[in-house]
Structure formats: structure tokens, C-alpha cells
Amino acid sequence: MNLQHHFLIAMPSLQDPHFMRSVIYICEHNKEGAMGLVINKPMEQFTVETVLKKLKISPTPRDPSIRLDKAVLAGGPLAEDRGFILHSPQEGFGSSIPISPDTMITTSKDVLETLGTPEQPKNLLVALGYAGWQQGQLEQELLDNAWLTIEADTHILFNTPIAERWQAAANKLGINIFNIAPQAGHA
């Protein structure tokens, strides 16, 4: 099982405050473990523009039609001081890894220098921190019914309002997430 480019959708019974009602985009999944970004938990009063100012980055030439007031996401409880930019494929960044034909992740500062300019990737989200699982840990959480999974949808990833992503991802499975019982059993 490889869940790269899939969503993990938190079951209603998951009460961990980092992951309650979360949607996680899995960036990497292999025999060593998994890494993903929570895509529906905005950081309070922290925007892309705030990040650029803190890092003293002034993108030029600035295109005023490109909004920089998008929320920065709390990507997960690990390495919360590290930034991750999930975006549509675009060449030329120092530290980018393709995830799917429609998404790549970049951790180098050079992508930030394009934000708000015509060179900015078409679709993007910025997250601080990530979620990670050791070997076999995610698989066990799936067996424990902590998560639902579905192949990622770039419309949900980049275009669906943040507050609607959990329900929208579950709707892709054809279910109303609010109708799921808080406990699950095995037959």
C-alpha cells in the first residue's frame, strides 16, 4: 500500500487536538514511514505576507493582483519551525520533490521569493511543520480506524475553502462524515 498523493481524513472519533477533524495530504509514504501536511488547520493571524515579512523577503516585481493574505497552515506537530510549500509543478526551485503529476513540495527559500510575482506557482499552500509516522505506524492507525483514505483531489487541496476541506474530502468517498459512529468495530 502506497498512500503518497492521498488524503487521510480523520475519523470523528479521533480526538488528538493536532489531528481532530483534519485532512492530511500524504507527501511521502514508503517502507520507512510516511510524511504529510495537515491542509485544513490555519495558523491564527499568520499569513503568507507575515512569513515574507518575518524572513525579510520582498518579492519583485510585485503583482498586486496576487493576494498574499492566504493563511499559513499548521502542517503538523513536527518541526513546526520548518516551512513547506505545496504547489503545482514548476521547475527552477532548489529543493523540490514531485509528488504527483499535479503537485510538488518545495522547502527551499527561493520559492518564497516568487510569491506575489508573476513567477509564483499557479496553485500553492504554505505550511509550517509536518505530520510524520515511523515504519508501520500509519498502517496501524488505519487498522485502528483512525483515518479514512482517498486519492488526493487538487481542487480540494488548493481551491476548497480551508474550513470545508474535511467534509469535502469525506464527500468524495460518498459519505456524510457527520453520520459516522464515533466507535468502529471489526466483523
Swiss-Prot record:
One of its GO terms (cellular component) is cytosol. Pfam families: DUF179 (PF02622). It comes from the Bacteria. SUPFAM superfamilies: VC0467-like. PANTHER family: UNCHARACTERIZED PROTEIN YQGE, UPF0301 PROTEIN YQGE. Belongs to the UPF0301 (AlgH) family. This is UPF0301 protein YE3428. NCBIfam families: PRK00228.1-1. The lineage of its organism: Bacteria, Pseudomonadati, Pseudomonadota, Gammaproteobacteria, Enterobacterales.
